Design a protein with these regions (language model features):
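The alpha-helix within a helix-turn-helix
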Residues: 31-33
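Helix-turn-helix DNA-binding helix
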Residues: 42-43
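Long, low-complexity, charge-rich intrinsically disordered regions
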Residues: 1-2, 6, 70-98
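Short capping segments at the starts of secondary-structure elements
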Residues: 23-27
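Short alpha-helical segments that sit at the start of domains
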Residues: 1-17
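Short Lys/Arg-enriched helix C-cap and helix-to-coil transition segments
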Residues: 54-69
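Residue-level detection of the helix-turn-helix DNA-binding "recognition helix"
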Residues: 46-51
Length: 98
């Protein structure tokens, strides 16, 4: 298989991070642990979800200190999460994620 394009890997990374959030892997440290991606990449990917019209927001834990909480997907926009679930092995292989 040839090397995947940067466009494909960027798209798949966004889909995979959105999927992880929807499955409860919903903090930057948890995303880093699940994927092995650096903190900055995880943060940039979270920000980039809006470019796919995926609505993702940070929800502060009530009564917790500053920036303690988790991310939540409130709208998948044009993305079908069932497609992501069906293609998880391909997505993870393309991104070299465990």
């Amino acid at each position: 298989m040839s090397e995947p394009s940067k466009t494909r890997t960027s798209f798949y990374r966004r889909l995979y991070v959105a999927w992880l959030i929807s499955q409860g892997t919903d903090t930057v440290p948890a995303i880093m642990e699940a994927t092995g991606m650096p903190r900055r990449t995880a943060q940039d990917t979270l920000t980039a979800l809006a470019e796919l019209d995926i609505s993702c927001a940070f929800e502060q834990t009530e009564g917790a200190r500053h920036l303690q909480g988790h991310y939540r997907i409130s709208d998948w926009g044009p993305i079908n999460p069932a497609w992501i679930k069906a293609k998880l092995p391909l997505i993870k292989e393309t991104l070299s994620y465990p």
